[in-house]
């Protein structure tokens, strides 16, 4: 009688959904009951209280836990897409694991199967293979431990320096901050490039698009910006530091290797994370890499620090997403891109933000790169990203081949919010420059048709040519903001109007060397005050005049 009661108690304790419980678990329960029956004689000799306590101990000591895993089987596999049957409770964008050890991500949740994109070579998977849920949405390691490292789209180290030591992980697909935590852009993000910092200034928390044809210097602007942050990151003021994340999407491995070497030579890798999903990587990894890099940048933003992320380039991410979507049988739209390709980029770029003080005051600045075909900015992806971002730096092939580098088209380039973040000193010297350059371009188009030009027009042309020369800058040689102010001051105030255009670059190099070596106090004053006072203006005028007299002589 006792053994029957014990068995009944054990069965009642088991889950009601008997279908989920393995037969082994039930069998072990009945074996335990039989063992109780065998020792019944011994139990009858003891007292009732002692007997019940022994029963409790034995029942509680029995391990009735069952490890349940939801698994499915591969129905078909090809082109990096697996159709899986049986994962009834899988979540969207959940990581799944194949029996070969490969990982994948569930994207299409259909009534009778799940469409899984494979992170790797699908030749290792065959029909009938078991697929199991991991229960985790795709996440990556984040934290300062990643600085100086090169990782793949899943956050695994690929630089041969051992595993990443970070204990913190973060989902790749987090929602962008709402309206309340944000604040308007107000701090400058200095690129060290004269043409950008003076004409299309960028603020911390801004999204500024770099757009242009191939081989026009888009990546160079991004790399110069990273190198320029060394002057701030070498200091001790955490508020001035800017951590950098460079996401390489669909590039050649040799290109990424050269880039890492360039950053290492400039001593910039120590504050930079490189996320690489090269052309030979699977399309899902190229799709995922920008989101992974963004999560790494958000760690700094949400901890009251400042970060810069460069997506190079989002055109290739859109192509990878188009490939996945078409293979998943999603309906194509314009240029065969799926209908949600706008959302693909908007949900990524909206995560760049300047947070208010109640939320730590951190920022994440985004510099997405888009490659155009023959300068066509009216194509689908370029127009999408232009409408999402807070401005664009437009690079032209024609200017590049004329030797104007960086090849920025000042007329088409704009920064919608950056002027609020521009330093006052730069506003004072560069305020009229954009207008003068615009007038120069307009007049230059007509000047080639006739030679009879009035003095004012000739003056406009003369000034425009010299300002264009002044904005030229070598690759990997970013300048401090106070040095830019000194050089642009000489051009805008007309001191270079009588100098031959061919001598402008030579003058600039000599003048900068002179100012840095002889007038460091003035540069320090401009840097500290953030503006040109009357005394600084008079001093600058004196320095430029005296130097020009000696330079021309």
Swiss-Prot record:
Protein name as catalogued: ATP synthase F(1) complex subunit alpha, mitochondrial
Main location: mitochondrion
Modification sites for N6-acetyllysine: 123, 126, 132, 161, 167, 230, 239-240, 261, 305, 427, 434, 498, 506, 531, 539, 541
Functional note: Subunit alpha, of the mitochondrial membrane ATP synthase complex (F(1)F(0) ATP synthase or Complex V) that produces ATP from ADP in the presence of a proton gradient across the membrane which is generated by electron transport complexes of the respiratory chain. ATP synthase complex consist of a soluble F(1) head domain - the catalytic core - and a membrane F(1) domain - the membrane proton channel. These two domains are linked by a central stalk rotating inside the F(1) region and a stationary peripheral stalk.
Originating species: Homo sapiens
Glycosylation positions in this chain: 76
PROSITE patterns (alphabetical): ATPASE_ALPHA_BETA
Phosphothreonine found at: 134
Tissues of expression: Fetal lung, heart, liver, gut and kidney. Expressed at higher levels in the fetal brain, retina and spinal cord.
